[in-house]
């Protein structure tokens, strides 16, 4: 078995990843499979922070399209991420992993608030820390929250788990001639306006010299291969 290249990682999971083949919500088989992929990495001693999206329940931008106030819609989206974080924490429990949920919004009867020092202590104790409610502020995506939390906890890399196996020159579902990048610089990704992550997240990671790897969470063993430094997905570098 290969040794892990990274000691501490920040994993960004989209809410849509939890849906599986369903149109909405959380698919039990899918979340169990994702936990299995994460457990394989945790069992190697890697410290794992997770930022979870909420698009399987509510997406702020979708709310604004119907005339909803943007800040209100974004706060609703943040609450959706807390629901996903709780579901993920329980799924970890069922597969034998110890996890803690921290929320950027105060919901203390349900989950504990985000406290950086406590999060780092949990990681050092071998617990998985799931960060809910994004940054706690409207107008910022959960991708930006992943860049922020990754920087705060001293992660060595941000791993963005998606439905596709990397960053493409165009949407591979719409353009059959689209090609996948093995590596791409932050500046090139920003200048090409590649939609896999927003520019704010790219810029923050670039400024902190925090690399990003974009890969498919549905490709068995892909997460472990990325953590072990094998060629998987697309690496975004400084």
Curated annotation (Swiss-Prot):
Annotated function: Catalyzes the reversible phosphorylation of UMP to UDP.
Gene responsible for this protein: pyrH
Biological source species: Dechloromonas aromatica (strain RCB)
Example GO biological process: 'de novo' CTP biosynthetic process
EC number assigned by the record: 2.7.4.22
Entry keywords, A to Z: ATP-binding, Cytoplasm, Kinase, Nucleotide-binding, Pyrimidine biosynthesis, Transferase
Protein name (record): Uridylate kinase
Cell location: Cytoplasm
Lineage of the organism: Bacteria, Pseudomonadati, Pseudomonadota, Betaproteobacteria, Rhodocyclales
Binding of UMP, residues: 54, 74, 135-142
Keyword presence, ATP-binding: yes
InterPro entries the UniProt entry points to: AceGlu_kinase-like_sf, Asp/Glu/Uridylate_kinase, Uridylate_kinase, Uridylate_kinase_bac
Keyword Kinase annotated: yes
Pfam families referenced in this protein's UniProt entry, alphabetically: AA_kinase
Catalytic EC class: transferase
The protein's assembly and partners: Homohexamer.
Activity regulation, per record: Inhibited by UTP.
PANTHER family: URIDYLATE KINASE, URIDYLATE KINASE PUMPKIN, CHLOROPLASTIC
Domain of life: Bacteria
Entry's family note: Belongs to the UMP kinase family.
SUPFAM superfamilies on file: Carbamate kinase-like (SSF53633)
CDD domains on file: AAK_UMPK-PyrH-Ec (cd04254)
Predominant cellular place of this UniProt entry's protein: cytoplasm
GO MF annotation list: ATP binding; UMP kinase activity
Catalysed reactions, as listed in the record: UMP + ATP = UDP + ADP
Involved pathway(s): Pyrimidine metabolism; CTP biosynthesis via de novo pathway; UDP from UMP (UMPK route): step 1/1
HAMAP family per the UniProt record, alphabetical: PyrH_B
């Amino acid at each position: 078995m290969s040794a892990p290249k990274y000691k501490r990682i920040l994993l960004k999971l989209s809410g849509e990843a939890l849906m599986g083949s369903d149109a909405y919500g959380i698919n039990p088989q899918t979340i169990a499979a994702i936990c299995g992929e994460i457990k394989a990495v945790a069992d190697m001693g890697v410290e794992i922070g997770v930022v979870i999206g909420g698009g399987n329940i509510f997406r702020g931008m979708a709310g604004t399209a119907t005339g909803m106030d943007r800040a209100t819609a974004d706060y609703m989206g943040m609450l959706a991420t807390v629901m996903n974080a709780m579901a993920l924490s329980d799924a970890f429990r069922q597969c034998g992993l110890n996890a803690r949920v921290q929320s950027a919004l105060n919901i203390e009867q349900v989950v504990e608030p985000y406290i950086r020092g406590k999060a780092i202590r949990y990681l050092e104790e071998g617990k998985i820390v799931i960060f809910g409610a994004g940054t706690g502020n409207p107008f910022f995506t959960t991708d930006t929250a992943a860049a922020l939390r990754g920087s705060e906890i001293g992660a060595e890399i941000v791993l963005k788990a998606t439905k596709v196996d990397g960053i493409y020159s165009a949407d591979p579902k719409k353009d059959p001639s689209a090609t996948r990048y093995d590596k791409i610089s932050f500046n090139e990704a920003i200048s090409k306006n590649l939609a896999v992550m927003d520019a704010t997240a790219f810029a923050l990671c670039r400024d902190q010299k925090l690399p990003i790897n974009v890969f498919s969470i549905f490709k068995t063993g892909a997460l472990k291969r990325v953590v072990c430094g094998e060629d998987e997905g697309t690496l975004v570098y400084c």
